[in-house]
Amino acid sequence: MSGQVPRVPEEMFKEVKYYAVGDLDPQVIQLLKAGKAKEVSYNALASHIISEDGDNPEVGEAREVFDLPVVKPSWVILSVQCGALLPVNGFSPESCQIFFGITACLSQVSPEDRSALWAMLTFHGGGCQLNLNRKCTHLVVPEPKGEKYECALRRASIKIVTPDWVLDCISEKTRKDEALYHPRLIVYEEEEEEEEEEEGAGNEEPDSPNEGSTDGKSSPASSQEGSPSGEPPFSPKSSAEKSKGELMFDDSSDSSPEKQERNLNWTPAEVPQLAAAKRRLPPGKEPGLINLCANVPPVPGGILPPEVRGSLLAPGQSLQGPERPEVMAAWSPAMRTLRNITNNADIQQMSSRPSNVAHILQSLSAPTKTLEQQVNHSQQGPASAVLLGQVKVAPEPAPAPQPILHLQPQQLLQLQQQHLAQQPYPPPPPHPFPPPPAHPHQFPQPPLQRPQPPLQQQQLSHLQQQQLQHLQRLQQMQPTPTAQLPGPPAQALQPPPPQAQAQPPLFGHDPAVEIPEEGFLLGCVFAIADYPEQMSDKQLLATWKRIIQAHGGAVDPTFSSRCTHLLCESQVSGLFAQAMKERKRCITAHWLNTVLKKKKLVPPHRALHFPVAFPPGGKPCSQHIISVTGFVDNDRDDLKLMAYLAGAKYTGYLCRSNTVLICREPTGLKYEKAKEWRIPCVNAQWLGDILLGNFEALRQTQYGRYTAFGLQDPFAPTPQLVLSLLDAWRVPLKVSSELLMGVRLPPKPKQNEVTNVQPSSKRARIEDIPPPTKKLTPELTPFVLFTGFEPVQVQQYIKKLYILGGEVAESAQKCTHLIASKVTRTVKFLTAISVVKHIVTPEWLEECFKCQKFVDEQNYLLRDAEAEVLFSFSLEESLRRAHASPLFKAKYFYITPGICPSLSTMKAIVECAGGKVLSRQPSFRKLMEHKQNKSLSEIVLISCENDLHLCREYFARGIDVHNAEFVLTGVLTQTLDYESYKFN
């Protein structure tokens, strides 16, 4: 900077709250203060991060986690010179920019073109100057002549390029090979060359290769159109205009205003989904249970290099399911299970799912319990068809028409699939798959072409040995698959129809027999494998059976020749091999969910409908951190489940730690950022193929098969991988007339009885509530919440409460009485315990109604000996502590975005207990400042397994990070346990 400080317009930086990383030039600080900028000592409060060092960890977390703009000090200087705040996009110090580390000398270009090139280079992280000296890395010159050119030729450290190199790098968003843009490669037409010789001298600046240190001063992008200097490759004015137009368009789409980009890197997976789920529920209905996040394994090691990543198949957690309530009732293995008590069901929900993957077999919520009552009592109406929480799915928007660019790989992919499907034993394809084995059920083995660490070799060898034994059994036992029908020639020039397969058709029931919708499982006899071993509560298996029987099916306790279907998770088991030998239909609980929604026995048609090709606990994607874009509702949930089954971590946000982005379309902010950060972008088939045994796909993220987007059904399985699994579906399931005549299903409700079906809303409808007979003063009016009851029971309680003059509390903060029959880990219970005066049983309300006044609560306080033993606490003591002082008073919490239960739920629980939740991640410096200064509030870090990559710096510096139980169990027991729930 020059010694003279430029005049700063008054209040120019008034809206800027800056956080300085590293040492800044004192004059930059002076300019900021003169413009009324405010320095903050905590980066979460900043609007701008100012730093020269783009590799500083604080800069990385500001961009990746908080999505804050990070600028170089030159942004301040040039903003002052221009008299206005410049866009932050062109001032990033980070090394991910196209021209980072480049200092270019511009020579022999017109002033207009020089301004344009200067702007392009500096905007994308480079530097420009007019003098050729030791600082220069590139010489930008349109012709192979001049003193600077001759000097640069003698220096191997200086690369010589034409201006086209700058334009092409920007248009393709990557640094191009300079050797292809050397000016001597240009071929000139003679006439134009002569014109150029006449004009060139006037446009060329002095060609002095001196070693002076003058750096050309930076300037903001010029708004003028660049005028040509005469050289053909760069000179046409239309070309310059076009390039600049594309540049501005690309930049605006890349780094549009902060408010648009703010949702990219810090997108809590849970918060919007919870809101969306509530929108799909009937008015007033709440999600049944909190999915209290589960496994808390040790902090994983660093991400392995690409050649090793994904090939480790580590035994570990059992395979589990998706986030929103999705199938029947939760099962869980015992892997340091986080303790959990359910709310309005006697069935205990055990949560050992990862934070972003809720239970595929979730505890039955009120609608499904209604189904059980219908099954048991027959007077209610037909059994509900949905085991999965009965969330009404909003129609998914149809994908936009694909441009020709994307149609071509899609057509090629379909042609390849059609051609391969026509051959009983397809020849080795030239792309993703290794040569198919002779036996149609065999799956490709994980490749061993690259050296593996000893632990990975051992685990991989163990998996291969299991698969080999499994495949040998299949070779001995499996019948020859039915002959395949000839198909159209593979040389067809048009893609086949979506459902055109060279296979015999697939059937559910015999098409000639009409099956009643209520009994769509007639003739199906299920045996269940894999799942029972993972169910901590054996009552859940009985629930499955009741639901299957309610739709005409049957469940046998053991596998027998009578069985038609095997419900299983993995293809690697003796029971699965026996079922395949006997040509039984082998499907998953996810398929059962699908047919329950459709009320029709349809063949499996998604990758999740088939058992996985590795043993339970096998994790082919254990080193992957996956994010998705373009998928909504059920499709997004399916991808979460697929990621979990494959052993990958799932994040709802995208940051540089992600290893794969699964896209529906090659569009959107996440996609653009993934390309910028060189994160592979694949379609959903990539993950489906891995689940079904094509482990070679782990190293094929760049193959055309997995980068063809806009597929009609991205979740459809690859035909070659499921040929044998679909074999049993080529024969229709026959249902005898005796079975059709003899079946008795729950009767349909009569038309006049429909209105009497109990409402699902926990709040009584306004018209059902009588006006209060007593009017109490606000101080004497109880504000009540109910938790753990059936909706119809809650409605009756609310009527009595209103008659007595009480009110239903709008929120836990305004609640004075919580009515519950037992201790439950619901949102209401865990928020109310910190603020209510009394937690009482329903008998208190009954006694009040009997006496027609509110009676003393002491004789009706809730006592739950079982829960108090389980959690080693006293509810009475917890309430006493909460009344004495809020548990989290004077404490700040930072909770990572992928936490489970959702961020909004955790925030409500923390705030009711007196704490505050920070919206942005605190820096190490800020944490140490709060830790060492006792007058500052303590900052507690809460995370989950899927977000541990966001906490690497904390672990490296020995800072404790806790799981959600620090909060959940903490508020229940009203204690702070800093040891039991921290990640090691």
Swiss-Prot record:
Q: Which Gene3D superfamilies match?
A: BRCT domain
**What are the boundaries of the region Interaction with PAGR1?**
94-183
Q: Bias regions of kind Pro residues — which residues? A: 424-454, 486-499
Enumerate the transmembrane spans. Answer: none
Per UniProt, which keywords does this protein have? Chromosome, DNA damage, DNA recombination, DNA repair, Nucleus, Phosphoprotein, Repeat, Transcription, Transcription regulation
According to the UniProt entry, which residue ranges have a biased composition of type Polar residues?
752-761
Q: Which residues form a coiled coil?
A: none
Query: Which intervals carry biased composition (Acidic residues)?
Result: 188-208
CDD domains recorded: BRCT_PAXIP1_rpt1, BRCT_PAXIP1_rpt2, BRCT_PAXIP1_rpt3, BRCT_PAXIP1_rpt4, BRCT_PAXIP1_rpt5, BRCT_PAXIP1_rpt6
Name the GO terms of the biological process aspect.
DNA recombination; DNA repair; negative regulation of DNA-binding transcription factor activity; positive regulation of transcription initiation by RNA polymerase II
User: Motif Nuclear localization signal residues?
Assistant: 583-600
Q: How does it assemble?
A: Interacts with the C-terminal transactivation domain of PAX2. Forms a constitutive complex with PAGR1 independently of the MLL2/MLL3 complex. Interacts with TP53BP1 (when phosphorylated at the N-terminus by ATM). Interacts with HLTF. Component of the KMT2 family MLL2/MLL3 complex (also named ASCOM complex), at least composed of the HMTs KMT2D and/or KMT2C, the common subunits ASH2L, RBBP5, WDR5 and DPY30, and the complex type-specific subunits PAXIP1/PTIP, PAGR1, NCOA6 and KDM6A; required for the association of PAGR1 with the MLL2/MLL3 complex.
What does this chain do? Answer: Involved in DNA damage response and in transcriptional regulation through histone methyltransferase (HMT) complexes. Plays a role in early development. In DNA damage response is required for cell survival after ionizing radiation. In vitro shown to be involved in the homologous recombination mechanism for the repair of double-strand breaks (DSBs). Its localization to DNA damage foci requires RNF8 and UBE2N.
What name has this protein been given in UniProt? PAX-interacting protein 1
Upper classification of the organism: Eukaryota, Metazoa, Chordata, Craniata, Vertebrata
